[in-house]
């Protein structure tokens, strides 16, 4: 049965990748269909009730700078906000919010339902329609066929999903949801490499059975951070505390005693789990010398008693879960509301993707989220936005776009995946970026919003606010550079007590702000140096740009040098056997990874500078040297 309308872009899946993909495509004017197995779970936070963190918060800010929904929804749902690494430099500071699951889901659904050009339809997808190497539509569970020249798959953990609790297992996409078995079988027929990964979640605890007085309270920040560049602290709901407790030797003995019934340690689970979010049984086994592990006791919302004990993800049998929970301080009488579990699922080798997230073998088919081997809401949302945007660009006959590694963490994420692939769930860290001094949370809008506007992702309201902020920053920087103070000036009497050494020569206000002991609020508080900018985010940007200008210029020089050949394209039909001087090892690596640019090739493990030089000489001789857009 054929659906009565044709669409430009179809998005399959309504998680964090799917919602951002659908919204991006629709914002750009493409007639978009979002297909989900359950409209009520659109925007569902399947695992931990939190958004942001180190590296992840940077991605959220980038999604926001490109007009995405994640940060906006977090501001309306965040019940505790903290700035991590606040005592360190701005490059590694990160915003993290504890979120009310229901409020977050409702806000995402509200944004989806009010988005022009977007249709939502509830049906699971069982089949892709591919003709002559190009996707032309999908077929749902009930046999309903939808046509579109571009399809974005964001299936999360649903592809061949299998849930494990102890030695028992059953098919599922997540607890309470069916898996996508037919679609998984169909995708395995495609010429794309497939593997299995694993992730897990902890048991949920009833707050009424926890003694919080035995734990350490962890409050949010004051003043409260805001996640979105267009957000307001007044959007935040009621704020609550989290708590901290620890496992102990008794907990570890209980876990060790249950390992013979662990699906991980009995060989039942084949998939590889996330290195940076291991299960508690994995932590106890791998770090046998540690006598305790920290657990964050996180509320799941304002109107629920469910607690998420972050740090004890497990797939041990229920009786072992209950005993280990009750061995922890403050949880001696705890009751489990939902058992923890592990889930195995299919993922596809991201090296088979272009950096637009379109598959290399099937035109018009895009993958985003956990299907590409990543873990985390933020990584999924960022990929979803990029895939939805590029699907829309393709339908409009325009060239694909992906930020470079020096432009965005999103660029780092996609380049890592499409060049190197992954054999374990990939998560973002600031350490993955070579140019993190330039890729800060605070300047994500300065880096990306103008490009987002050009692409059609950024609406008039966001653009007006951004333009106003940019004007404020530029005007204030010009003022600081143009105002001078002389050692004999009347201003010096009020200024010198704030300086480590009195000024002995004429200096601009910018020179004074650059001093280590001075900051923008302090300088503006001194008579004659104000007025200060009212917009605190613009004021922060002024301070950072002045304080770090030397380091930023140095890093920009490094980028300019590296970028000279970064975007030099490698022809897709280039036969590396015909390139004189390449070793068999390099030829094998190039054929395996199929890099699109010299930059991607240079990051393949084992690739030598000599091999890159040989490639460049070959391209030049053949007249094939050209850059990507």
Swiss-Prot record:
<dbReference type="InterPro" id="IPR049312">
    <property type="entry name" value="GIDA_C_N"/>
</dbReference>
<dbReference type="InterPro" id="IPR036188">
    <property type="entry name" value="FAD/NAD-bd_sf"/>
</dbReference>
<dbReference type="InterPro" id="IPR044920">
    <property type="entry name" value="MnmG_C_subdom_sf"/>
</dbReference>
<dbReference type="Pfam" id="PF13932">
    <property type="entry name" value="SAM_GIDA_C"/>
</dbReference>
<keyword id="KW-0285">Flavoprotein</keyword>
<dbReference type="GO" id="GO:0005829">
    <property type="term" value="C:cytosol"/>
</dbReference>
<dbReference type="Pfam" id="PF21680">
    <property type="entry name" value="GIDA_C_1st"/>
</dbReference>
<dbReference type="InterPro" id="IPR040131">
    <property type="entry name" value="MnmG_N"/>
</dbReference>
<dbReference type="GO" id="GO:0030488">
    <property type="term" value="P:tRNA methylation"/>
</dbReference>
<dbReference type="GO" id="GO:0050660">
    <property type="term" value="F:flavin adenine dinucleotide binding"/>
</dbReference>
<dbReference type="InterPro" id="IPR026904">
    <property type="entry name" value="MnmG_C"/>
</dbReference>
<dbReference type="InterPro" id="IPR047001">
    <property type="entry name" value="MnmG_C_subdom"/>
</dbReference>
<dbReference type="InterPro" id="IPR002218">
    <property type="entry name" value="MnmG-rel"/>
</dbReference>
<keyword id="KW-0274">FAD</keyword>
<feature type="binding site">
    <location>
        <begin position="273"/>
        <end position="287"/>
    </location>
    <ligand>
        <name>NAD(+)</name>
    </ligand>
</feature>
<keyword id="KW-0819">tRNA processing</keyword>
<protein>
    <recommendedName>
        <fullName>tRNA uridine 5-carboxymethylaminomethyl modification enzyme MnmG</fullName>
    </recommendedName>
</protein>
<dbReference type="InterPro" id="IPR004416">
    <property type="entry name" value="MnmG"/>
</dbReference>
<comment type="subunit">
    <text>Homodimer. Heterotetramer of two MnmE and two MnmG subunits.</text>
</comment>
<comment type="function">
    <text>NAD-binding protein involved in the addition of a carboxymethylaminomethyl (cmnm) group at the wobble position (U34) of certain tRNAs, forming tRNA-cmnm(5)s(2)U34.</text>
</comment>
<dbReference type="InterPro" id="IPR020595">
    <property type="entry name" value="MnmG-rel_CS"/>
</dbReference>
<dbReference type="Pfam" id="PF01134">
    <property type="entry name" value="GIDA"/>
</dbReference>
<dbReference type="GO" id="GO:0002098">
    <property type="term" value="P:tRNA wobble uridine modification"/>
</dbReference>
<keyword id="KW-0963">Cytoplasm</keyword>
<keyword id="KW-0520">NAD</keyword>
<comment type="similarity">
    <text>Belongs to the MnmG family.</text>
</comment>
<feature type="binding site">
    <location>
        <begin position="13"/>
        <end position="18"/>
    </location>
    <ligand>
        <name>FAD</name>
    </ligand>
</feature>
